[in-house]
């Protein structure tokens, strides 16, 4: 711990970037890294490649016209496929729904749980590379936004509306990023302790000026992936607990049977 504190003090002008090799080490270094921010909320995001920046899918793969087309077609077609489709004017509800069902949006998923973030960092390909868990202080991000407010915003609130309009209704471009929370639309979002950053720009969040004031990066080397996955399994951080449907329960049970082939579920 003293060596970690010395590192943090020596690098206070740079974004914190530390390697973790176990669940315990992530808890230790993240608590130490965020100590200087006081008793405030922290969010985490797992990414399967440590080389990836913090950019939503829609900004990686689409221009603004493409983003508008995706949103428009989804909203027009959803009412016959989803019995609880929001009113067409409720942009925040539509943005949450699009994100929930996997449409590329200007939202990035975060979680209040570092263990949930670790699960997503290690859950999918590429397994041969280092993964990462990002840490964020949402109130500090919003403090350097256009609103200069050290608090967490609501996706349905006035602060987020200009960014929603830009993505869904051909409003003017707003090159800002906000940390927002939204109403839980199903049990999955509750179990994953979900939150979001809302991006009005394709510039990676980690490359924005002042990112060291609200971001930290914890790198998981390839050599530690399997050990950490075993630790998460032991701690009960499993797929069916984060995706509470029968398809994911079946996938988890199948995986568990492969893990312990002689065990039988009676």
Features from the language model and the residues they span:
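Catalytic-core elements of nucleic-acid end-processing and repair enzymes
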Residues: 1-266
């Amino acid at each position: 711990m003293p060596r970690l504190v010395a590192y943090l003090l020596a690098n206070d002008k740079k974004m914190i970037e530390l390697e973790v090799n176990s669940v315990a080490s992530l808890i230790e270094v993240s608590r130490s890294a965020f100590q200087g921010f006081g008793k405030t909320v922290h969010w985490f995001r797992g990414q399967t490649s440590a080389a990836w920046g913090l950019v939503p899918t829609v900004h990686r793969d689409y221009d603004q016209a493409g983003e508008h087309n995706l949103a428009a077609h989804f909203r027009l077609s959803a009412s016959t496929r989803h019995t609880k489709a929001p009113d067409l004017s409720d942009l925040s509800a539509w943005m949450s729904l699009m994100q929930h069902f996997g449409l590329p949006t200007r939202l990035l998923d975060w979680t209040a749980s570092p263990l949930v973030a670790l699960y997503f960092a290690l859950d999918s390909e590429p397994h041969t590379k280092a993964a990462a868990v990002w840490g964020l202080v949402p109130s500090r991000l919003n403090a350097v936004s256009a609103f200069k407010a050290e608090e967490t915003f609501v996706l349905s609130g006035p602060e987020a509306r200009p960014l929603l309009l830009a993505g869904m209704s051909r409003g003017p471009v707003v090159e800002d990023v906000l940390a927002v929370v939204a109403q839980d639309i199903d049990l999955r979002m509750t179990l994953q302790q979900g939150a979001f950053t809302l991006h009005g720009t394709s510039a990676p969040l980690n490359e924005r000026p002042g990112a060291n004031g609200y971001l930290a990066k914890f790198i998981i080397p390839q050599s530690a992936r399997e050990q950490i996955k075993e630790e998460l399994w032991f701690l009960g951080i499993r797929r069916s607990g984060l995706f509470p449907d029968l398809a994911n329960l079946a996938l988890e049970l199948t995986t568990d049977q492969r893990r312990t082939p002689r065990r039988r579920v009676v």
